[in-house]
Amino acid sequence: MAIIHPKVRGFICTTTHPKGCELNVRDQIEATRKLGVREDGPKKVLVIGASSGYGLAARITAAFGFKADTLGVFFEKPGTETKAGTAGWYNAAAFDKFAKAEGLYSKSINGDAFSDEARAKVIELIKNEMGGKVDLVIYSLASPVRKLPQTGEVIRSALKPIGQPYKSTAIDTNKDTIIEASIEPATEQEIADTVTVMGGQDWQLWIDALAGANVLAEGARTVAFSYIGSDITWPIYWHGALGQAKQDLDETALRLNQKLAGEVKGGANVAVLKSVVTQASSAIPVMPLYLSMVFKIMQEKGVHEGTQDQLDRMYRDRMYRTDGAPAEVDEKGRLRLDDWELRDDVQNACKALWPQVTTENLFELTDYAGYKKQFLNLFGFERADVDYDKDVATDVKFDCVEL
């Protein structure tokens, strides 16, 4: 038991609130339920990177939107009697509790999702507990490091531009001030390493392993999540080292799509999602300012979505349409859920606003207050229905295999 308040260092909140995290998950489940439960979608779903952000939302839509059995893989720190674990641990615990209450199969694996050991355990569980096959594999890993399964070498990714230094207005989120950020370009080695960590190599290893073990159902599909963004963030993102990794993901999708079409009459796509507040996005310089602006503009236009809205739309309007039509894709075969964010009226409003923002008017011209609240929400804080001066149990156990 402990009394827990937020402590923020840099772009990380070092504390988490178990009760707040549970209520966040409950709210996401309720939002999905409101759209109605369908029986005509995925039935057995594997989510790689299932404990927060888009991966968690994908698991929630599968279970509570389509009554699917789910297996989730993630790398989180469990809580102990005296110390809170990571937010993802409590998210996964809450998901498991609510799924089981609904009579759905739910199992989780806590370990390095980049490892062959994790793949072997997943295959074993699919064979022994999930009827032998899965029909949807969601790939949603966001990690700054990857340990290569063959050699054990640890590779790190770099959030850097390519070619020349990147200079831009940004928010110092610790001081709530507008600053000039400058980031030196990535070296060739850093670019290659970023592709190794964040590209499609591991996704390919997962699908190869699952296909090789014959645990992919007829018609099985796989989706990996990506972000492209607008030209406002391109220098650091799409045209930076990370963009090279995401292009590698696109190429991997084309290969996997051919493979699955041939082997199980299935398919593979990259899904390009909108920018949202996640632990991953807050680490990208310039993103907090861009998010604060784009949220305000999209709210004013009535097209703002959170992680759960995006995933509900991906399943319902793209992948599993009630009219049975194939999903709408772009020229690279990608599912585009960033369509509303990239509307000309939204982006032009952002570009007009960008040069006007100063430390003095930051809270007034943008939804930076909303950004900050959502950031703390990720860790279970800033909820009106939680008394943060009360003791809360930190040692939460659930149906999770520790690797």
Swiss-Prot record:
Q: Which domain of life is it from?
A: Bacteria
Catalysed reaction equations from the record = a 2,3-saturated acyl-[ACP] + NAD(+) = a (2E)-enoyl-[ACP] + NADH + H(+)
> What are the site positions for Plays an important role in discriminating NADH against NADPH?
E76
Give the residues the record marks as binding NAD(+).
49-54, 75-76, 112-113, 141-142, 246, 276-278
Q: What class of enzyme is it?
A: oxidoreductase
User: By its UniProt entry, which InterPro entries does this protein fall under?
Assistant: Eno_Rdtase_FAD-bd_dom, Enoyl-CoA_Rdtase_cat_dom, FabV-like_NADH_b, Trans-2-enoyl-CoA_reductase
- Keyword field contains Lipid metabolism: yes
User: Which sites are catalytic?
Assistant: Y237
Q: What is its EC number?
A: 1.3.1.9
Identify the metabolic or biological route this protein is part of.
Lipid metabolism; fatty acid biosynthesis
Task: Describe the function of this protein.
Answer: Involved in the final reduction of the elongation cycle of fatty acid synthesis (FAS II). Catalyzes the reduction of a carbon-carbon double bond in an enoyl moiety that is covalently linked to an acyl carrier protein (ACP).
- Record family assignment: Belongs to the TER reductase family.
Record's HAMAP family? FabV_reductase (MF_01838)
Oligomer and partners:
Monomer.
- In Swiss-Prot or TrEMBL terms, this protein is called Enoyl-[acyl-carrier-protein] reductase [NADH]
What taxonomic ancestry is recorded?
Answer: Bacteria, Pseudomonadati, Pseudomonadota, Gammaproteobacteria, Pseudomonadales
Supply the gene name.
Answer: fabV
